[in-house]
Amino acid sequence: MPRTDNDSWTITESVGATALGVAAARAAETESENPLIEDPFARVFVDAAGDGMWSMFANPALLAGAPEIESQVGARVRQMIDFMATRTAFFDEFFLGAADTGVRQVVILASGLDSRAWRLPWPDGTVVYELDQPRVLEFKSATLRQHGARPTAQLVNIPIDLRQDWPAALLDSGFDASKPTAWSAEGLVRYLPARAQDLLFERIDTLSPAGSWLATNVPQEGFSDPDLVRRQHEEMQRMRAAAGRLVEIQMPAVEDLWYAEERTPVADWLGEHGWRASATTSAELLTRYGRPVPDDAEGPVPPTLFVSAHRPAA
């Protein structure tokens, strides 16, 4: 379903369902022979949600039991799992690196089913603020409580749509804008219109004193090319058709949730505003972690840049 200005969702709908897809990929990676990451809660979320498009990623036996379907989408599923594994490792290492510099205030924007507040070894005194849609945070908190999980940092949930005045909600919840902060915007930007992307980073910039850190993944140049968009839509439609034969549930058109618009280059913008930023392509990240690089651009993972930035003292 195409996006609207004030749309909202539960964990199994719209953008919320993509969080389950990410969790399913993390579960599959965690349970693989040589995992890049360890996320013990990913499987918990997937099992709590029941069957859906995410089942294709979380349950390899589904594909193994249907070889004619596996031949169509098996490689694409593996590509998605590899991408999510390397993405997760990138952000895990970012947060632990920021903590090593003494940062004790963390903000995870559009946290979805991110479980870093429960699974990373945060230093004593760390406060983690998580922002997302109310029903998404409710599902995550309730599911983890039912399994006896306890945060490894002081956790503050802020149920809010990021199209609203989230900086005010963050400040009202105890966030200290005078302290260095580690920010993440993981898997978020492509779901925002271009102007909303600009506003997001303007707000982060305003709330970030010297010593702050930022990590995000953003659409790579060419993301909005009409021919590439068309080919990606066709490929995703084939994947949905195959998935629909594995689980008896309608597959949402995830690509319709993206905004294929020309955007401000984030790393350049940050550099112009006092940050030291670097960008890594998804292909470079896959290579760094020893995962194969897809030989085409129209698969389930659009061209992506991973940006990390630090604001030094003036």
UniProtKB/Swiss-Prot annotation:
Pfam families linked: LCM (PF04072)
GO molecular function, one term: methyltransferase activity
Keywords assigned by UniProt, alphabetized: Methyltransferase, S-adenosyl-L-methionine, Transferase
Annotated residues for binding of S-adenosyl-L-methionine: 132, 161-162
GO biological process, one term: methylation
Function per UniProt: Exhibits S-adenosyl-L-methionine-dependent methyltransferase activity.
Family: Belongs to the UPF0677 family.
Protein name: Putative S-adenosyl-L-methionine-dependent methyltransferase MMAR_5323
Organism the protein comes from: Mycobacterium marinum (strain ATCC BAA-535 / M)
